[in-house]
A protein has these predicted regions:
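TPR alpha-solenoid repeat register
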Residues: 51-52, 85
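C-terminal/domain-edge helix-coil "capping" segments
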Residues: 1-44, 48, 62, 74-77, ...
Length: 109
Protein backbone atom coordinates (compact mmCIF):
# COMPACT_ATOMS: atom_id res chain seq x y z
CA UNK A 1 0.00 0.00 0.00
CA UNK A 2 1.35 3.41 -0.98
CA UNK A 3 0.48 6.52 0.98
CA UNK A 4 -0.46 9.63 -0.95
CA UNK A 5 1.37 12.75 0.09
CA UNK A 6 -0.52 16.01 -0.24
CA UNK A 7 1.33 19.31 0.03
CA UNK A 8 1.54 20.28 3.67
CA UNK A 9 0.13 23.66 4.68
CA UNK A 10 -0.53 25.20 8.03
CA UNK A 11 -4.09 26.45 8.28
CA UNK A 12 -6.31 27.46 11.14
CA UNK A 13 -9.57 25.54 11.14
CA UNK A 14 -12.44 25.97 13.60
CA UNK A 15 -13.00 23.31 16.25
CA UNK A 16 -16.63 22.49 17.00
CA UNK A 17 -18.01 22.94 20.52
CA UNK A 18 -18.07 19.67 22.40
CA UNK A 19 -19.29 18.17 25.64
CA UNK A 20 -15.71 16.90 25.93
CA UNK A 21 -13.58 20.05 26.46
CA UNK A 22 -10.42 17.96 26.80
CA UNK A 23 -10.58 17.05 23.13
CA UNK A 24 -10.50 20.71 22.08
CA UNK A 25 -7.37 21.21 24.18
CA UNK A 26 -5.76 18.11 22.64
CA UNK A 27 -6.58 19.25 19.10
CA UNK A 28 -5.23 22.76 19.75
CA UNK A 29 -2.03 21.20 21.16
CA UNK A 30 -1.62 18.96 18.11
CA UNK A 31 -2.13 15.77 20.15
CA UNK A 32 -4.31 14.29 17.42
CA UNK A 33 -3.82 10.62 18.32
CA UNK A 34 -5.02 11.20 21.89
CA UNK A 35 -7.92 13.32 20.65
CA UNK A 36 -8.86 10.59 18.15
CA UNK A 37 -8.87 7.99 20.92
CA UNK A 38 -11.14 10.12 23.14
CA UNK A 39 -13.44 11.13 20.29
CA UNK A 40 -13.81 7.55 19.06
CA UNK A 41 -14.89 6.50 22.55
CA UNK A 42 -17.30 9.44 22.78
CA UNK A 43 -18.86 8.83 19.37
CA UNK A 44 -19.23 5.09 20.04
CA UNK A 45 -21.49 5.98 22.98
CA UNK A 46 -23.25 8.98 21.40
CA UNK A 47 -22.64 10.07 17.82
CA UNK A 48 -22.79 13.82 18.49
CA UNK A 49 -22.18 15.57 15.14
CA UNK A 50 -19.79 18.10 16.74
CA UNK A 51 -17.64 15.24 18.02
CA UNK A 52 -17.80 13.55 14.60
CA UNK A 53 -16.65 16.80 12.96
CA UNK A 54 -13.76 17.14 15.44
CA UNK A 55 -12.83 13.51 14.80
CA UNK A 56 -12.76 14.28 11.07
CA UNK A 57 -10.60 17.30 11.79
CA UNK A 58 -8.07 15.08 13.59
CA UNK A 59 -8.03 12.55 10.76
CA UNK A 60 -7.54 15.38 8.26
CA UNK A 61 -4.66 16.77 10.35
CA UNK A 62 -2.80 13.43 10.34
CA UNK A 63 -3.42 12.91 6.63
CA UNK A 64 -6.03 10.14 6.81
CA UNK A 65 -8.35 11.76 4.30
CA UNK A 66 -10.52 8.66 3.86
CA UNK A 67 -11.51 8.56 7.52
CA UNK A 68 -11.80 12.36 7.58
CA UNK A 69 -14.24 12.18 4.66
CA UNK A 70 -16.27 9.44 6.34
CA UNK A 71 -16.61 11.24 9.68
CA UNK A 72 -17.29 14.65 8.11
CA UNK A 73 -20.04 12.98 6.04
CA UNK A 74 -21.54 11.37 9.16
CA UNK A 75 -21.59 14.76 10.92
CA UNK A 76 -23.13 16.46 7.88
CA UNK A 77 -25.76 13.73 7.47
CA UNK A 78 -26.75 14.25 11.13
CA UNK A 79 -27.11 18.03 10.60
CA UNK A 80 -26.96 19.10 6.95
CA UNK A 81 -27.70 22.72 7.90
CA UNK A 82 -24.40 23.09 9.76
CA UNK A 83 -21.94 25.01 7.59
CA UNK A 84 -18.92 23.79 9.57
CA UNK A 85 -19.64 20.16 8.66
CA UNK A 86 -20.18 21.05 5.01
CA UNK A 87 -16.87 22.94 4.95
CA UNK A 88 -15.00 19.92 6.33
CA UNK A 89 -16.55 17.67 3.71
CA UNK A 90 -15.82 20.28 1.04
CA UNK A 91 -12.13 20.46 1.97
CA UNK A 92 -11.73 16.73 1.45
CA UNK A 93 -13.73 16.80 -1.80
CA UNK A 94 -11.52 19.64 -3.07
CA UNK A 95 -8.36 17.68 -2.22
CA UNK A 96 -9.85 14.68 -3.96
CA UNK A 97 -10.44 16.64 -7.17
CA UNK A 98 -7.04 18.37 -7.08
CA UNK A 99 -5.00 15.21 -6.44
CA UNK A 100 -5.66 12.23 -8.73
CA UNK A 101 -3.68 9.86 -6.46
CA UNK A 102 -5.77 10.88 -3.47
CA UNK A 103 -8.93 10.41 -5.54
CA UNK A 104 -7.87 6.83 -6.31
CA UNK A 105 -7.08 6.23 -2.63
CA UNK A 106 -10.49 7.52 -1.51
CA UNK A 107 -12.35 5.70 -4.27
CA UNK A 108 -10.75 2.40 -3.27
CA UNK A 109 -12.30 2.53 0.23
Amino acid sequence: MRRVSVTEKTVSLPIANSDHPNTKILIEAGAYDLAIEQLQQATAEDSNPNDLYNLGLCFEAIGDYGLAHTTYREAWEADSENLLYAQGLGRIERLRHENPQLKRQLDSR
